[in-house]
A protein has these predicted regions:
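Metallocofactor- and cofactor-centric catalytic cores in central/energy metabolism, strongly enriched
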Residues: 1-166
C-alpha cells in the first residue's frame, strides 16, 4: 500500500480557490489541508449523524434569519426520528422547488432511517443538524457555528458524520 501525499488526503485540492472564484467576496483564505478520517469499524456498526446546510428545521420552530446580509450563525437540531411532514425548509439562497416536492433530495432523513433499519449503517444519533449555508463571514462561521455544531455532534455520541451542502 502506498503512502498518500498530504495533498491527496485533503477534501479536494484547490477547494477554497474554487469557492472564492465562484462566490466573490466569500473571503475564504484557508491554505491548510482538510484531513479525511478513516472509520475505525465497519459503517454498519458506526453511529452516524447528518449535518446539512439546507436550512431544514422542525415545523413550528423559530425560522432561520435568511435575510441578514452576513447569514445566520445558528443551527437547529432535527430529531433523527422525524417524519418529513414534521420538517420545513427556510432558505431563499437556492432554488427549493425539488426540496419542496421531496425533502429527501437535500435532507435524506428517510433514506438514512431506512439504511439504519437495514443495518447498512449503524444506529443514528438522536439528532441531525441543519443550518443555512449562506455565510459571508467564513472566519466567524468557523469560530462559532462550526465549533458549536461539532460540540453538539460529539455530545450526541456520533462516531461519523455525513456532511451535505445544499
Amino acid at each position: 500500500m502506498t503512502e498518500l501525499s498530504d495533498e491527496s488526503k485533503q477534501l479536494r485540492p484547490g477547494l477554497w480557490e474554487t469557492i472564492n472564484e465562484r462566490y466573490p467576496g466569500s473571503m475564504i483564505t484557508k491554505k491548510e489541508f482538510v484531513p479525511l478520517a478513516r472509520l475505525s469499524k465497519p459503517l454498519s456498526q458506526t453511529r452516524l449523524t447528518f449535518v446539512s446546510s439546507a436550512g431544514i428545521q422542525p415545523r413550528g420552530t423559530l425560522p432561520f434569519d435568511v435575510v441578514h446580509p452576513v447569514g445566520d450563525f445558528s443551527f437547529h437540531r432535527v430529531p433523527s426520528t422525524s417524519k418529513v411532514s414534521d420538517l420545513e425548509i427556510h432558505q431563499i439562497k437556492y432554488p427549493t422547488t425539488g426540496a419542496l416536492k421531496d425533502l429527501n433530495v437535500i435532507f435524506p432523513i428517510e433514506r438514512l432511517q431506512e439504511l439504519s433499519a437495514e443495518h447498512v449503517i449503524g444506529e443514528l444519533t438522536p439528532n441531525f443538524f441543519s443550518f443555512i449555508g449562506y455565510q459571508m463571514d467564513p472566519s466567524r462561521f468557523e469560530r462559532t457555528l462550526a465549533e458549536e455544531i461539532a460540540n453538539a455532534v460529539v455530545a450526541d455520541g456520533a462516531e461519523a458524520a455525513l456532511l451535505c451542502p445544499a
